[in-house]
Amino acid sequence: MRFLLTASLLTFATLAPAQTVDEILAKNFEAKGGLAKIRAVQSMRVTGKITLGPGMEAPAVIEQMRGDKVRMDITFQGMVLTPMVLNGSSGWKLMPIQGNPNPEALSPEEMKDALEQADMDGFLIDYQKKGHTVEYLGKEKVEGTDAYKMKVTLKSGDVRTVYIDTDSNLEIKLESKSTRRGAEVEGDTNLGDYKEVDGLILAHSIDSGQKGAPGRQVITITKVEINPKLDETRFVMPAKKETPAPVK
């Protein structure tokens, strides 16, 4: 009897963490509108502004489609900057502010970031199918708010720590650890100002910073369009401009 009881307790102890993870995530998905509504999103356009520092604001538009397609445009100092575009398995950027009028292919590290951004459902939904692992690390206070602490190890090996409000069941903070150019880079993102858009509950304030780096980047979202008709050619890398022949 003692052996059977011990075996039962060991079995429960083995299953409990996975059950806890799935239970917390199920409540999180429901709080955001439910899996059916989340998976029904085929495209999205987000309009807002990015604050890069005191007095430095820039309008921004992010367009996204399923099939790993995402594009960000920022208007700054009279120029349209496109720091990231992903079109399936290829990516590019166009940054005339850096003196180059032509598009450039994303580096392997930039591609890694872009692919994570392009996951419309986020890395928590279907995390096992995507090759990620999730661990529940207990509860922790985040600026006075009780939160579930979840460690996510992405398929790439990068680590994300997600804090989910125990009352609202919505994400309030994300910490990241990534390897860039052989060095570990740490960052954090605060999520807030959640609003309902077509049955989905979405954060409209995203405050990000990198450990050891000055300043923070704040994205304030003013409009979200669900399933807008997007022009797929906008994700295609444009041809390079011809360089005028020198005048003889």
Regions found by a protein language model. Name each.
Residues 13-15:
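N-terminal signal peptide c-region/cleavage motif recognized by signal peptidases
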Residues 22-99, 131-138:
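N-terminal mature ectodomain segment of secretory-pathway/periplasmic proteins
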Residues 92-121:
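Acidic/charged, solvent-exposed loop-and-adjacent secondary-structure segments enriched in E/D, K/R, S/T
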Residues 1-5:
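Positively charged n-region of N-terminal signal peptides that target proteins for export
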Residues 18, 71, 77, 143-238:
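Gly/Pro-enriched, hydrophobic low-complexity segments
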Residues 113-151, 170-175:
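Short, conserved active-site entrance elements at the starts or edges of catalytic domains
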